[in-house]
Curated annotation (Swiss-Prot):
Reaction(s) catalysed (UniProt annotation): L-alanine = D-alanine
Gene3D superfamilies in the cross-refs: Alanine racemase, Lyase, Ornithine Decarboxylase, Chain A, domain 1
Annotated source species: Streptococcus equi subsp. equi (strain 4047)
Sorted UniProt keywords: Isomerase, Pyridoxal phosphate
Gene responsible for this protein: alr
UniProt superkingdom: Bacteria
PANTHER family: ALANINE RACEMASE, ALANINE RACEMASE, CATABOLIC-RELATED
UniProt-listed PROSITE patterns: ALANINE_RACEMASE
Protein's name in the database: Alanine racemase
InterPro entries: Ala_racemase, Ala_racemase/Decarboxylase_C, Ala_racemase_C, Ala_racemase_N, Ala_racemase_pyridoxalP-BS, PLP-binding_barrel
Pathway: Amino-acid biosynthesis; D-alanine biosynthesis; D-alanine from L-alanine: step 1/1
Protein purpose: Catalyzes the interconversion of L-alanine and D-alanine. May also act on other amino acids.
Amino acid sequence: MISSLHRPTVARVDLEAIRANIDHIHQHIPKKVRTYAVVKANAYGHGAVAVSKAVEDQVDGYCVSNLDEALELRQAGIDKEILILGVILASELQLAIKHQLTITVASLEWLELAKKESVDFSQLHVHVKVDSGMGRIGVRSLAEANQLISILSDMGVQLDGIFTHFATADDSDHAMFDKQLTFFKQLVEQLDKRPALVHASNSATSLWHSETIFNAIRLGIVIYGLNPSGNSLSLPCPLKEALSLESRLVHVKQIQAGDSVGYGASYVAAEPEYVGTLPIGYADGWTRNMQGFKVLVEGEFCDIIGRVSMDQLTIRLPKAYPIGTKVTLIGQQGKQVITATDVADYRGTINYEVLCLLSDRIPREY
């Protein structure tokens, strides 16, 4: 998808805020812990290459979800370790080796496929994934983990780490978290051969369970300044939201009582009023169900009226503003603020999704 550089809708990313967030988190966690910045999904919508370069001196490596995301960083000149958290195709192992990427091995079945590939396994770097209760990928028993590690050793693979992922680290109820942690700790302690790196801490764990950190952490949503729990748990350290989303009025008019706005005529004016149109819609990640939510115009909240279209939306204005007036969809204007979490709460989702859905049509400015 082409970035729409000639349209007045832009996501502004404060790279200094991201750096400050990492500094604050580092002050909150134990020293001498290896730090991975999670920059998957285009750095949660913030721009993977720009973010990775901005924090290069603050982290030891990066986490991405797939091979293509890793290759994007390598092609941009990022030379630190890149850990691919998802499972890659065994047929793509040569690419991973060529670009010195660390891959995740999550099952014996996948390993049997990998063994058939004609590659130099001594150049392959691996972390083993343990499914301690998340239910997605990973080995599920000590026996399976030991067997996997034994085969990897026989193949001459560089076995660098072992890790798991918590399902409820951002929940006030710790029962599931404690169960997963106990399982993972016991498995690691009983391994026949323990890799050098052991990590289980994602953003939430690093904030609220820092006592459980092993010797590496994966920092995701927190470096972008968002609370992993939404508003459920209080943050133990200050964070600043790094992304703001802005557009501008491209059309302003007065409508009369009885006039409708948008597909399905879902909004009908009860009285004469001014309305304005913004060049942003659901193709940009501003979803159709945002009708009734608010944006900021000159520091005042204005309602989104009518259904959000693919490329445009309409807002009710208190007066006739000139074309080109700035409108804030996420961020601060004057004393008022709209956060990604506010948007998520309105949609009935999580702040992660709000940012990740912002499409490539929206240019990022730094």
